[in-house]
């Protein structure tokens, strides 16, 4: 029998959820730490065995999952005294739309994205040379790279993509990404920048939508990342389940923390906001603001969409320790 070492925590979590979904709350919020392995060449901050610290939300189809994960991860980094880092964010649907718009065939997307992922190392000219060297039409390559020169790294860049990629990019994908960026920017606790990066690819082929990475100048690269993987659990159950995760490299963070001192904050009673589905962004921002204040006060806070069987949902929350529950309605 062939054997292998665990590559990440996402696949095992998906398998666990697939086997126990009926016993778990929905959405299911998981926090885990564990060792994983890579066939990498060891160097500063890069190891063949290292520990990942993951937070995931399974069963939540809306972008509330992305907003919560990014806010939670960046709040943690802020409490560890990290400042002026960048959350680079993109969406796999943007990558595919830009490739289609430029004339690349769908079967060539993976190859094109592998080259695009080298943008930080070889630059625009290097990417152009490699794509042409791989036999892609010069017209497609030039049209493709012209997009990256035109698109800005903010919400205006997202809006430009929505306008320019009509017929290739679903408008709701652009609207969702813009909402994530603006919501996080308005509610963030730490000092960091949200940057729309249309060149961000991330290597995991299982991502289906939003993808993001944490970049720190003092490290010279990424210290964490994640994204949406709505098709993963369906491989085990036959039914797709929405899921988003964010992972931080423990050793990389500790390596940077060794230069400073830090004390773990004490925890206080848990609080849950039970919100009506399809809550307007303005109302959602109010909830996120209140949750931020509660977290600043040292409380563990959960925001979850209201279900039809509210009584059972509250019982589940109580079992998880959320005894202080606030219901939020549109009106």
Predicted regions and their residues:
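Acidic, His- and aromatic-enriched active-site or binding-groove loops in soluble protein domains
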Residues: 1, 104-127
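A residue-level structural signature of the nucleotidyltransferase/glycosyltransferase Rossmann-like core
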Residues: 2, 86-87, 245
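Positively charged, Gly/Ser-enriched RNA/tRNA-binding surfaces
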Residues: 8-21, 30-82, 131-331
